[in-house]
């Protein structure tokens, strides 16, 4: 009984407290309770590291510095008595974006500008008393993108250019000289290959049987002459035109040789008694062979007796 009354009184007190606090705003902090590190203003008695304002005769976004009592490393402006390492301006006779350097007493390694007689993007160097390895420009007689080197006294390993290439006419002259030398080397070999065939055809006066046995020798000379003709035909592209002209002359000489000298065809086997006649018939059956440069050959295996 006593406990229930005590609990009911406690609940009544809590409800009254809740009704009294309902609808009231929370207490706000007063301005005098703000800490010093959270307060920023432009008062004259502020610490130098926390005080910033603008000059009275300069735009707000262009000039900023600290109080006069601030150290020089934290103070920046364009005054004429500023340190040379922190002072930068442009020359009076140069565009603002192309020419920048430090004070007149700055070291040469920190002073850069462009030459007055060169484009801004192609020629750059340092002060006149700078080291030669730090000075670069282009040659006056070369394109800007192909030839670059340093000062005139620079080592040759830092100078690059393109070597000279022989022209197309010189290459053709070299190739034609090699072809002429090869042709002169092959011509004596062709004459040596056709020589034994000429000698073997005229010395058969002993008898018909020996002349008949000596008949299979000309095909060897003909094969050597044909092999030489293929090599020479590759070297001379106008072989077909020359072969047609020489073919007509050889046919004319061959007919003239048989009509005007009837004894020459039988003279090879003169003492043999009919051996030369069989030899002439064998050559007539086979026909006239072809040899040097695709031309026709006579019975002794040479072109009208001249050889290849």
UniProtKB/Swiss-Prot annotation:
Disulfide bonds join 292-308. Residues 198-209, 265-277 have a biased composition (Gly residues). Residues 1-23 form the signal peptide. The modification Pyrrolidone carboxylic acid is found at residues 39, 51, 63, 75, 87, 99, 111, 123, 135, 147, 159. GO terms for biological process: cGMP biosynthetic process; receptor guanylyl cyclase signaling pathway; regulation of blood pressure; vasodilation. Residues 24-38, 42-50, 54-62, 66-74, 78-86, 90-98, 102-110, 114-122, 126-134, 138-146, 150-158, 162-249, 278-286 form a propeptide. InterPro entries: Natr_peptide (IPR000663), Natr_peptide_CS (IPR030480), Natriuretic_peptide_brain (IPR002408). Residues 210-227 have a biased composition (Low complexity). One of its GO terms (cellular component) is extracellular region. The keyword Amino-acid biosynthesis does not apply. Keywords: Cleavage on pair of basic residues, Disulfide bond, Hypotensive agent, Metalloenzyme inhibitor, Metalloprotease inhibitor, Protease inhibitor, Pyrrolidone carboxylic acid, Repeat, Secreted, Signal, Toxin, Vasoactive, Vasodilator. The keyword Mitochondrion does not apply. GO terms for molecular function: hormone activity; peptidase inhibitor activity; toxin activity. It is found in: Secreted. Expressed by the venom gland. Residues 172-228, 252-279 are annotated as: Disordered. Residues 172-182 have a biased composition (Polar residues). pEKW and poly-His-poly-Gly peptides may serve as metalloproteinase inhibitors during glandular storage. Their inhibition may be instantly disengaged, by dilution or physiochemical change, when venom is injected into tissue of the prey. In the C-terminal section; belongs to the natriuretic peptide family. PANTHER family: C-TYPE NATRIURETIC PEPTIDE (PTHR12167:SF2). This is Snake venom metalloprotease inhibitor 02D01. It comes from Echis ocellatus (Ocellated saw-scaled viper). The lineage of its organism: Eukaryota, Metazoa, Chordata, Craniata, Vertebrata.
């Amino acid at each position: 009984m006593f406990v229930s009354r005590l609990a009911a009184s406690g609940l009544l007190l809590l409800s009254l407290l809740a009704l009294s606090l309902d609808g009231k705003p929370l207490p706000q902090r007063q301005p005098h309770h703000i800490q010093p590190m959270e307060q920023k203003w432009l008062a004259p008695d502020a610490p130098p590291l926390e005080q910033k304002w603008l000059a009275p005769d300069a735009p707000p976004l262009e000039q900023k510095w600290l109080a006069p009592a601030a150290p020089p490393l934290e103070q920046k402006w364009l005054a004429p008595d500023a340190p040379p390492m922190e002072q930068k301006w442009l020359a009076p006779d140069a565009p603002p974006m192309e020419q920048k350097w430090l004070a007149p007493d700055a070291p040469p390694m920190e002073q850069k500008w462009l030459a007055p007689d060169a484009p801004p993007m192609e020629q750059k160097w340092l002060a006149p008393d700078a080291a030669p390895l730090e000075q670069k420009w282009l040659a006056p007689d070369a394109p800007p993108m192909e030839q670059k080197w340093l000062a005139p006294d620079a080592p040759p390993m830092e100078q690059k250019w393109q070597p000279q290439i022989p022209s197309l006419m010189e290459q053709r002259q070299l190739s034609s000289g090699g072809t002429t030398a090869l042709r002169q080397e092959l011509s004596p070999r062709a004459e040596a290959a056709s020589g034994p065939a000429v000698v073997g055809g005229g010395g058969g006066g002993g008898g018909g049987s020996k002349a008949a046995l000596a008949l299979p020798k000309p095909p060897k000379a003909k094969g050597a002459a044909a092999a030489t003709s293929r090599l020479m035909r590759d070297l001379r592209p106008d072989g077909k035109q020359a072969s047609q002209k020489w073919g007509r002359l050889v046919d004319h000489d061959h007919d003239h040789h048989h009509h005007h000298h009837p004894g020459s065809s039988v003279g090879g086997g003169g003492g043999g008694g009919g051996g030369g006649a069989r030899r002439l018939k064998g050559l007539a059956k086979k026909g006239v062979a072809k040899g040097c440069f695709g031309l026709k050959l006579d019975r002794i295996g040479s072109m009208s007796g001249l050889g290849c």
